[in-house]
Amino acid sequence: MKILIVSKCPTHPTDAGNRWWILSQAEMLISMGHEVHFLYINELPLKRNAAPYIESLEQTRKYWGDKFHLFTVSKFQKYKMIAAKLYRMKFGHNYWKVDDQYPFGLEQMVNELDGTIHFDVCIINY
């Protein structure tokens, strides 16, 4: 089977539990003979030093090679998501709609990848 794993969390360096889980999941699926691709949702921080994020991105890209796909959240989109978060906190009693933090354009990219590669399974990780 062709499998797409989608995550905002890079797989490398494997120095946190969620990264370890995603990589272990991928390696298990690969060991079973499946073709596994990784779509990384890149959301750079606005105020923090971006160097560690860029380093993680490069290490993840290197590991996955041609099975690596990148979706980058624009700064405008990031500000929009922050505004929605602040609005929900102030006026919505922290009630969130399911798509409040869903990056615009991600669905289109997944559909384009699926149209080209024809995935059988799509796994979404945190």
Locate predicted features.
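N-terminal subdomain of nucleotide-sugar transferases
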Residues: 1-68, 115-116
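Residues that line or immediately flank small-molecule/substrate-binding pockets and catalytic motifs
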Residues: 7, 43, 72-75, 126
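Extended hydrophobic/Leu-rich segments
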Residues: 64, 68-70, 76-79
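Conserved nucleotide-sugar donor-binding subdomain of glycosyltransferases
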Residues: 74-126
